[in-house]
Amino acid sequence: RRSGVVDVEWGNLNVRARPSTSAAIVAQAPDGAPITVLNTANGWHLVNYNGTIGYVSSEFVTLT
């Protein structure tokens, strides 16, 4: 488990139900939002964002 911060140039980071860009969006996290990284695999982080568990692309999270 690691702490991270959302780092997007525009809009929000989509938190998805599965590690796929076609998966359903379960939450959206704004730039600078704190996020907890639970696991990482194949370019995706499994995260807890405000109590919602889902997947985000690892390129848009800066680990702290």
Can you annotate each of these PLM segments?
Residues R1-N14, A27-D31, L38-A41, S58, ...:
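SH3-family beta-barrel domains
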Residues P19-A24:
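Short alpha-helix capping/helix-loop boundary micro-motifs
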Residues N48-E59:
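Short, compositionally biased
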